[in-house]
Amino acid sequence: NFDSVSLRERNISDEIYGMTSKRLPVTLDPTLCVDANTWDKIINRAWEKRRYIVLYHVMLRFSPIVHSILLNKVNQIAKFHGWDVVDLSIGNYSVNDFVSIIKYAQCVVTTSFHATVFSIIFSRPLFPVRLHDGNDARYVDLLNALNIGGVLKDLDFDDKVPPKIDYKCVHDALTKLREPSLDYLTSCLRPC
């Protein structure tokens, strides 16, 4: 028995509506409900002095060939700019290091919702790569909601310089998206 339910994905809300005729509200992922100042409290500044590009392919174990293609592209971009490569797809990183590595990256190449989120929060140059594998909806929807869906790349991209993103406009749009989510969550937590 629940008093309130919300979802983080519009496509799931649409599926539930199709089965039940009940429209469930879609709220932002909790990582987006706070701004960079909140995330800065857990930052590991040891990453600040390094110059590197980040790769994070969340589905590595299911698609090693895709990871290999992405890593090759990242290595080409790194060589072009004289950067090191940090591959978050391999190894175990704490939440602090994951967030910190993205915060201080010169550029992020990812197929991950959360790497996209933190790139946006910290205004990092970004290549979000759409694989058309059914796992792209969350970050594709987010980028479209922030009016930057045009930065999405397909796996065959060969750019060496990330697309320009007007992060002031992005953060303004994110603030507008954040308000109804926080209002809904606050209303759910009020005592009856």
Locations of regions flagged by a protein language model:
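Active-site anion-handling motifs in enzyme catalytic cores
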Residues: 1-192
